[in-house]
Amino acid sequence: MYDYIKGILTKITAKYIVVETQGVGYILQVANPYAYSGQVQQEVTVYTHQVIREDAHLLYGFATENEKSVFLSLISVSGIGPTTALAIIAVDDNDGLVRAIEQKNITYLTKFPKIGKKTAQQMILDLEGKFVMSEEAGPVQQVAPSSENIALEEAMEAMEALGYRPAELKKIKKFFEGTNDTAENYIKSALKMLMK
């Protein structure tokens, strides 16, 4: 098991980041890879959780220990796997998640991808009163305007990797057309829109 990996961020994709340390590049699946956009070729510390399956050894990465703690709580719920837990964390509304669990708000919880009514009920049953979280906001980064909105395309690709359907993403993309922001901010805004 690894608690964290400290090294140079060398690559960002829609599903994962690569952190190189001691000549080894570790693939870390993270909730929002583009949150690391401004840190390419810089030293980063990513908190990790390793999942060993019959067909794969996977590392999941988190920006903070709090994010990792939420992930571990979520995957302890029957019916929630690592991919779904990452999608929930990607919304970046920890207070809203806690509030929904404490208030038994099934409607809010079922807005997450792959969370149905039964899984939402199980989340409430297993997690009610278990954790208190506070929102942690990252720095806002602006990008230079361009004719092609690559950041929006990257954001939509990352959202699809989190399990959102193309039909949902088409509406979101249309809403953001003509705007200019970072992929990270597009993802945060889109996730908040989908949770309404």
Curated annotation (Swiss-Prot):
Molecular function (Gene Ontology), one example: four-way junction helicase activity
Residues annotated as transmembrane: none
Protein location: Cytoplasm
GO cellular component annotations of the record: cytoplasm; Holliday junction helicase complex; Holliday junction resolvase complex
CDD domains: UBA_RuvA_C
Region listing for Domain I, in residue ranges: 1-63
SMART domains: HhH1
GO annotation terms (biological process): DNA recombination; DNA repair
Keywords: Cytoplasm, DNA damage, DNA recombination, DNA repair, DNA-binding
Region of interest (Flexible linker), residue spans: 142-146
Region annotated Domain II, chain positions: 64-142
Annotated region described as Domain III, given as residue ranges: 147-196
Signal sequence coordinates: none
NCBIfam families: ruvA
Protein family membership: Belongs to the RuvA family.
HAMAP family hit by this protein: DNA_HJ_migration_RuvA
Subunit structure: Homotetramer. Forms an RuvA(8)-RuvB(12)-Holliday junction (HJ) complex. HJ DNA is sandwiched between 2 RuvA tetramers; dsDNA enters through RuvA and exits via RuvB. An RuvB hexamer assembles on each DNA strand where it exits the tetramer. Each RuvB hexamer is contacted by two RuvA subunits (via domain III) on 2 adjacent RuvB subunits; this complex drives branch migration. In the full resolvosome a probable DNA-RuvA(4)-RuvB(12)-RuvC(2) complex forms which resolves the HJ.
Role: The RuvA-RuvB-RuvC complex processes Holliday junction (HJ) DNA during genetic recombination and DNA repair, while the RuvA-RuvB complex plays an important role in the rescue of blocked DNA replication forks via replication fork reversal (RFR). RuvA specifically binds to HJ cruciform DNA, conferring on it an open structure. The RuvB hexamer acts as an ATP-dependent pump, pulling dsDNA into and through the RuvAB complex. HJ branch migration allows RuvC to scan DNA until it finds its consensus sequence, where it cleaves and resolves the cruciform DNA.
Comment field on protein domains: Has three domains with a flexible linker between the domains II and III and assumes an 'L' shape. Domain III is highly mobile and contacts RuvB.
Full protein name: Holliday junction branch migration complex subunit RuvA
Protein species of origin: Streptococcus suis (strain 05ZYH33)
Taxonomic placement: Bacteria, Bacillati, Bacillota, Bacilli, Lactobacillales
